[in-house]
A protein has these predicted regions:
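Interfacial segments of multi-pass membrane proteins
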Residues: 1-3, 26-29, 47, 62-95, ...
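Cytosolic, membrane-interface loops and tails of multi-pass inner-membrane proteins
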Residues: 1-8, 58, 142-154
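Multi-pass membrane catalytic core of lipid/isoprenoid biosynthesis enzymes
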Residues: 1-27
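Alpha-helical transmembrane segments of multi-pass membrane proteins, especially transporters
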Residues: 11-15, 36-44, 60-68, 81, ...
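Alpha-helical transmembrane segments and their lipid-water interface positions
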Residues: 22, 51-55, 140-141
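Membrane-helix interface "capping/anchor" motifs
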Residues: 51-60, 91-104
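Loop-to-transmembrane alpha-helix initiation sites
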Residues: 77-84, 98-106, 117-130
Length: 154
């Protein structure tokens, strides 16, 4: 059963808000440059991937990750990196299955954050977020055929 377009948009907004709100508010009350800010970044993604009450029902935490990164506003470089690599591996170098695409996307995202972002708490938080998402995709990855194409060319 499908809820339709409006239900999908509302779900997307709620998933993004789940990550955005705690991080955005957290940076108002905590020093973003301090290590206590790392759990604020990681908790929404961890909670989505490994829910306390439904142990086997966790998601892959991609949308929650975007919400967390958008919550870092005005520092949006990490969110832009993640969006860039998702678009790149979905449109330019197309990698299937989706789980492998997500693993590579979050790997490249973490690497770029480590190279370009100078705030240690953001580096550590993004690295842990990438690890959580990669782990979730590895344990749910099917060993089907891997297809890579460039701009829809085989």
């Amino acid at each position: 059963m499908y809820g339709g377009f409006l239900c999908g948009i509302l779900s997307l907004i709620c998933e993004l808000a789940k990550g955005f709100i705690p991080v955005y508010l957290g940076q108002k009350y905590l020093d973003i440059n301090s290590l206590p800010f790392v759990p604020v970044l990681v908790a929404p993604v961890f909670g989505h991937a490994f829910p306390f009450l439904q142990k086997e029902k966790g998601g892959k935490a991609i949308t929650a990750s975007f919400g967390v990164l958008l919550g870092l506003f005005p520092e949006l470089h990490p969110a832009v990196y993640l969006a860039f690599f998702f678009i790149f591996f979905s449109v330019v170098v197309i990698i299937n299955p989706h789980s492998l695409r997500s693993i590579l996307t979050f790997g490249f995202f973490a690497f770029n954050v480590l190279l370009t972002i100078k705030t240690a708490s953001i580096q550590i938080g993004c690295f842990i977020i990438a690890g959580i998402v990669i782990y979730r995709h590895l344990i749910k990855h099917n060993n089907g055929p891997v297809r890579i194409s460039i701009l829809h060319q085989r």
